[in-house]
């Protein structure tokens, strides 16, 4: 590789919201904060987690509930 044209590829720390710390190599140059990792992701753990507790449509239906109107 040519010198001086590539970004520095250095070791950084990626910290997950569950508390696990992972050492990775990256060109980002700063520590990363992760929402999920392999130790807490529902696919890998087999546990379900309710991320969305209702959206805007549910809030609208609750707010403007008209009796007798159905789909």
Curated annotation (Swiss-Prot):
Residues annotated for Zn(2+) binding in this entry: 16, 18, 37, 40
Function per UniProt: Binds the 23S rRNA.
Cofactor: Zn(2+)
Cofactor descriptive note: Binds 1 zinc ion per subunit.
Keywords, comma-separated and alphabetical: Metal-binding, Ribonucleoprotein, Ribosomal protein, RNA-binding, rRNA-binding, Zinc
Gene Ontology MF annotations: metal ion binding; rRNA binding; structural constituent of ribosome
Alphabetical GO biological process terms: translation
Matches recorded under SUPFAM superfamilies: L28p-like (SSF143800)
Similarity annotation: Belongs to the bacterial ribosomal protein bL31 family. Type A subfamily.
Origin organism lineage: Bacteria, Pseudomonadati, Pseudomonadota, Gammaproteobacteria, Enterobacterales
A Pfam cross-reference name: Ribosomal_L31
PANTHER family tied to this protein: 50S RIBOSOMAL PROTEIN L31, CHLOROPLASTIC, LARGE RIBOSOMAL SUBUNIT PROTEIN BL31A
Organism of derivation: Photorhabdus laumondii subsp. laumondii (strain DSM 15139 / CIP 105565 / TT01) (Photorhabdus luminescens subsp. laumondii)
The name this protein goes by in its record: Large ribosomal subunit protein bL31
The keyword rRNA-binding is annotated on this UniProt entry: yes
Gene Ontology cellular component annotations, sorted alphabetically: ribonucleoprotein complex; ribosome
Subunit structure: Part of the 50S ribosomal subunit.
């Amino acid at each position: 590789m040519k010198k001086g044209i590539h970004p520095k590829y250095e070791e950084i720390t990626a910290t997950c919201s569950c508390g696990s710390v992972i050492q990775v190599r990256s060109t980002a140059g700063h520590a990363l904060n992760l929402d999920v990792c392999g130790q807490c992701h529902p696919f890998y753990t087999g546990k379900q987690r309710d991320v969305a507790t209702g959206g805007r449509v549910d809030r609208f239906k609750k707010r403007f509930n008209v009796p007798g109107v159905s789909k």
